[in-house]
């Protein structure tokens, strides 16, 4: 599990250092670069935590547990797994973008409801108090790809917050679509500085955790 996290953090840090993905708050004519991650691609990286020393990091994510595609019924959503790994590495604060109305437990029923929300351009109400993103130096934004788009609740979050002068590093879980161009949607909704998006297959995040933990344990013994 930590190897995926190291790849995510290393890519984001490299982009921060190089100033990648800066559109100056303007819409870009081309999509930001997208990285796709697998366990085998993850490389060990040293000093990752130090890059975030003294910085306030917010890791806002939307995730759904229950029945999911190709992984069956799960207690922890795929995107939540990645968000928690990022929090462990960066010391960032987690915020779950959770809608007041829960989605059905069954996968087919849930994605049909999500499709209806997308087609009618709904903005589901978010449960709980929202964080003030102006209090943070950087925001990681995580979500699953639903119907080639962000979950509508993520739009609710983005439109209620003020991202002026902020940097957003998007990451997603998917089963073949990659980022699906959602980095552009985030940029349009926030006018924030965007870093390249990172896409991780949901089955990798969900099913490879034990294997990754064992590989990581061997590497430090």
Identify what each model region corresponds to.
Residues 1-4, 8-9:
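Positively charged n-region of N-terminal signal peptides that target proteins for export
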Residues 15-19:
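C-terminal motif of bacterial Sec signal peptides marking the signal peptidase cleavage site
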Residues 64-67, 99-103, 145-149, 174-179, ...:
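Solvent-exposed loop/turn segments at secondary-structure junctions
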Residues 93-95, 193-201:
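Short beta-strand elements in bilobed, periplasmic/extracellular small-molecule ligand-binding domains
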Residues 220-221:
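Conserved small/polar residues in nucleotide/adenosyl-binding loops
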């Amino acid at each position: 599990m930590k190897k995926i996290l190291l790849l995510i953090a290393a890519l984001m840090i490299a982009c921060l250092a190089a100033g990648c993905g800066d559109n100056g708050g303007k819409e870009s004519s081309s999509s930001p670069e997208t990285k796709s991650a697998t366990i085998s691609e993850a490389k060990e990286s040293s000093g990752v935590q130090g890059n975030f020393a003294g910085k306030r990091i917010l890791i806002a994510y939307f995730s759904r547990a229950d029945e999911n595609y190709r992984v069956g019924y799960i207690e922890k959503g795929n995107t939540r797994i990645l968000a928690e790994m990022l929090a462990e590495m960066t010391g960032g604060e987690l915020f779950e973008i959770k809608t007041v109305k829960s989605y059905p437990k069954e996968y087919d029923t849930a994605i049909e409801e999500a499709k209806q929300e997308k087609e009618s351009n709904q903005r589901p109400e978010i449960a709980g108090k929202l964080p003030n993103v102006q209090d943070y130096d950087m925001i990681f934004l995580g979500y699953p790809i639903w119907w080639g788009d962000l979950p509508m609740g993520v739009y609710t979050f983005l439109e209620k917050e003020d991202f002026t002068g902020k940097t957003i590093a998007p990451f997603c879980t998917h089963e073949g679509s990659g980022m699906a161009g959602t980095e552009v949607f985030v940029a349009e909704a926030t006018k924030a500085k965007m870093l390249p998006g990172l896409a991780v297959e949901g089955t990798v995040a969900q099913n490879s955790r034990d294997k990754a933990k064992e590989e990581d344990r061997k590497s430090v013994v």
